[in-house]
Amino acid sequence: MTADYSFLKSFAEYIIDKLEKGTEVQIILPNNFSCLELKKILTDKYKIKLPIIIPFNSLISKKTDSDYVSKIEELLIISKIITEYKDLQFNKNESLKAAEILRKLINDLIINNIDIKLIEVYNNSNYWQKIYKFLEYCFLRWQEEISLTQKQTKAIHKLKLLQEEIIRIKNKQIILVGMFKPNVFLKRFEEDLKDYIVYYNQTSKQISDGISYYEPNDIYEEAVAIAYICSRNKDKRIAIITNNNKLKRVYCNFLDRYEDLLGNDLRLTNIGELLTSIIKILCNNFDLKLLFLLLKNPLINCSATQKLEVMLSNKNRFISSPKYLLQLQFDNEDTKEYCRNLIDILFTDNPHNILDILTLTKEIAEKLLPTIWEKEGGAELVEFLTNLTAYSKYINSMDKKDFPKIFSFLLSNIKYYKNTDSANIIIAPPEDLALCTFDLIILPHFNNENWTPTAKSHPWLSKKALQILNIDYNETASTLYSDYFNLFLQNKQVIILNAKKYDGKLSVPSNLFLKLQDVIPAVHYVIPAEAGIHLDMDSRRCWNDIRKDDIGDESTAHSHSFPSVLSVTDIETLIRNPYGFYAKKILGLRKKDNIWEEPKISDFGNFIHKVLEEYSKNYDKQFINLNLLDKQNALINIGNHILYGTILPNYTKKTWQIKLTAFSKAFILFDIERRKNCKEIYFETKGELRLNIAGQDIKIIGIADRIEISKSNHITILDYKTGTIPTKKEIELGLSPQLIIESLMLLENGFNIKNENTIVNSVGLGYKARGATPIIIGETTSNDVGKPKSIDYTIAYVKITSTEPYVQTTEIALSIETLNKHKAGLIKLLEYYVTNKSFSYDLNLSKYNDYLHLSR
């Protein structure tokens, strides 16, 4: 049968009976939401004068004129004390996190009137004595620092409020309704009023028959399922139960209107991230990434930001000073003016301490966004800034590079509540809603991590030590969550969700659900696959699952033309990734390296090629007579000179210098050895191969890193590789055709190369050696013209690394017959694309694909 039990309605009947007998009572519930619900029930159904109904926290949260040490000031004081303690070396960030735990421990001891010496002798181990000395030192120093403020702590202030309330309500009947999370104040309240407190915690054994269970594949599919359920139940009052703020943010991305009782981390709001970004800029050396982390904040992002980002992509992304920003070639004055204003606002002043940083942060934020404090969370944030500025003396001398993490941590302690009036969906932790009744309860991510959450062990005190101090509050956690769960099951409809995977780990159902399986023989599904959870959310649709019918028969891109000039790398792209070729060569699209990207392997490869090219081309003029060490130094100096004129991060330059130095000697020895058997060597030589394909003239161009002609007229084309070299199989299949095509260029006289015995004539340039008759490569001119010889070809990949072995050579011999087969295959490939001009989306054999997102 459908459950119709309501905890608060049941209590309302109970209390009406008490009130009718003239009993004066004070009703205390765990939270404000439950109080509002109870008042509504009593007002709507019984039309009576309401008794005093308050949440427990209101007893210790009244506003008074008393001045007390704020939480943020107390954390900074304790953090300073922890950092001072040299036997346990904490950095600033660690000490602040430890301060949160130590603050709670100190307050528990003070409120319970417990002497810390109680635990000094419970364990005589050296480890424990070391911990005890640390805790005692911090406790005594804390007392000294608090006395200097001439204020009481917030905990003592709350205790005084509680004591005043205890005196005021003594001799009245007090009813504690529902389940309360144990804490030091509740414990004190119960002890002092044990003769006056009545506990009401009656529950029903009845369980709804409207319970359903569903396992989405991941947390995003779970969020889609929640949104789908809510969209199908708009006329119902829905509660989504979670105490995980990270998961809540995922769920809320798919919901329009909801009331949020969990609250938002102020650090993660747009306004919080704006201030954090400003502080990162002020506390660090100039960094474009940090600059655009600020500029792309939704509150200040604009078209000028996007234009500036495009200008700073590719090589400009490594500029190391704001002054270089104004040296850019601006397309229009508006962007230039925008850039100039940014520099004036962000980089004019250089604050030296934390107080200056906080003051300047506020000024910069107001210049960038004059209405900043009117935004969501603005009031809370300006109050936080004011307090932190007031107490900055505790951290004023710290290294400013540590401050962004400190600021972010402190900000994460501030909650901001954004609620939507008249929303039928409420998101809250279980303790806030367990006593209330809803049409539909959704229990997402129902596993042991969230139901019941594992209690975190204390970093310094063992469980036994906590029990000796009588401040161990974790014992009742599992019982509490079991009670919450039982109450939720008494609602009309309950849907339990548990994503199969989260953060890459398999999810294990909660033990509470395993108990439920014994109660309900067959859990049915109210979210069948045909309901279309995935299909209703187009933005989450998985393209891999779309059938051809969904997009028609078109799986290719079409063009009206085919390029007449191709590079050897274009040919490889055409083979491995036809759509990438289409996007690059026909649409003219080029991927820009955005400012977030670090220097790539290909950037390092280009640098090494430049170094080796300059060294090799100047070898005969400058380096041939040098000894090994001087040649090595010359190679390194070439690299340093190139890096000096290149815009790169300093750490990248140092890394590349180290790598160049590592393999420099090995390369010099490799070069000397190869030169011994060569009569001619050509470096970075341009070549071309001309073909007529289906009536269209095609020119393929390429640059050979190194071409060697041996004393026996053996020709080797070498390619320097700092990355992965292709396999022999890839070369044989034509998937890595660069050196094959360069060999065809040689075969077809595509390079402008000559020597006394062998002439390789570039047809395009029309070069002819004086006194020599050009011949087709594949034959040799010798003193005995009547005896032509076939020339051998070899292609070689030279792998260069910064670890041993520094230089490795992989050689593959090629015959004229093999080259002719490859040429026939190349012609066939080009004939297909020149004739059809269609490029498949689906074929993608590339290791790196800049156009994959476009093909979708």
Curated annotation (Swiss-Prot):
Name of protein: Uncharacterized protein RF_0624
Native species: Rickettsia felis (strain ATCC VR-1525 / URRWXCal2) (Rickettsia azadi)
Lineage start: Bacteria, Pseudomonadati, Pseudomonadota, Alphaproteobacteria, Rickettsiales
